[in-house]
């Protein structure tokens, strides 16, 4: 590539950075939680909703948390009557839309845990969105019910 071509490419990258940062600034992470499992487990899942209020689609290309050696984007799929998880290289969030990471669907797999967080512990969960980290606190709990919510069923 010529010097002029390199300069042109760098110029385009520099121009694109503020646009990517502006889109990422309009992305919100909501309702994050980590599933509590027995302390002997070395993996668990995390869930949240990613809301994109920008006019551009954004791409989630990774995730991290201090409690896990690695985090993978996964989706639970049904194939031939069997449920299986498939790793996703990225998840796209369309402009003006939201994507929910939920049990039985898209989720974050937290692998190589040093220790399972206890119910009530809050951990930092970060997503890589358009190349930049966006972090949120995630409460550890047993199920998807919001903290403090109890389902009272009468028979």
Give the predicted meaning of each segment:
Residues 1-5:
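N-terminal secretory signal peptides that target proteins for export/translocation
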Residues 6-9, 33:
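Short helix-onset patch at the extreme N-terminus, typifying the N->h transition
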Residues 9-20:
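Bacterial N-terminal signal peptides
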Residues 26-155:
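Compact, glycine-rich, soluble single-domain proteins
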